Amino acid sequence: MSEAAIAKKAEEVKSVNAQLLAAESAIVVDYRGLTVEEVTDLRKQLRDANIKMSVIKNKILERAVEGTDYEDLKATFVGPTAVAFSDEDPIAPAKILKKFADDHDALEIKGGIIEKKVQTLDAINEYATMPGREDLLSMLASALQDPMRKIARAVKAVADKGDEEAA
């Protein structure tokens, strides 16, 4: 192999390593058996959520995780491998890929990283069923507003009762 090819592969390993270390989550999937239309649809769904999916050679991935906390992922680098990277919402890739895998038997989630930790397949599936960040924020806002509404109603009821007695 020429020095230029070796340098190119080393640069690719460095790039994948940087993506993995920067990502909030990276889910490893086997896409074997999906049609071109299905892969295009999956990529569109992921892109709409600001998630990048890349097909990466297993050897490149193995070298990219060497010496990191993600070495346990090496067991998932078998067969055709694609990785969905998210720098924002750590749960979004798991949710989208799980839903897609439920609808398309050919897609197999093999493992991944969520919130900078290697997760088991069971943990990834559990994360996928959790509400998203926006849903959780909305639930929190609602929970915080509810006591204030009750106090406002109580104060209004006392004020209305005072107005009735004064009349």
Swiss-Prot record:
Q: Which GO terms describe its molecular function?
A: large ribosomal subunit rRNA binding; structural constituent of ribosome
- Keywords from the UniProt entry: Ribonucleoprotein, Ribosomal protein, RNA-binding, rRNA-binding
**InterPro entries in the cross-refs:** Ribosomal_uL10 (IPR001790), Ribosomal_uL10-like_sf (IPR043141), Ribosomal_uL10_bac (IPR022973), Ribosomal_uL10_bac_type (IPR047865), Ribosomal_uL10_CS_bac (IPR002363)
Q: Which domain of life is it from?
A: Bacteria
State the Gene Ontology BP annotations: translation
Q: Can you supply one Gene Ontology CC term for this chain's record? A: large ribosomal subunit
Q: Can the keyword Methyltransferase be found in this entry's annotation?
A: no
SUPFAM superfamilies, alphabetized: Ribosomal protein L10-like (SSF160369)
CDD domains the record matches: Ribosomal_L10 (cd05797)
HAMAP family on file: Ribosomal_uL10 (MF_00362)
Oligomeric state and partners?
Answer: Part of the ribosomal stalk of the 50S ribosomal subunit. The N-terminus interacts with L11 and the large rRNA to form the base of the stalk. The C-terminus forms an elongated spine to which L12 dimers bind in a sequential fashion forming a multimeric L10(L12)X complex.
Task of the protein: Forms part of the ribosomal stalk, playing a central role in the interaction of the ribosome with GTP-bound translation factors.
- Family (UniProt): Belongs to the universal ribosomal protein uL10 family.
Q: What is this protein called?
A: Large ribosomal subunit protein uL10
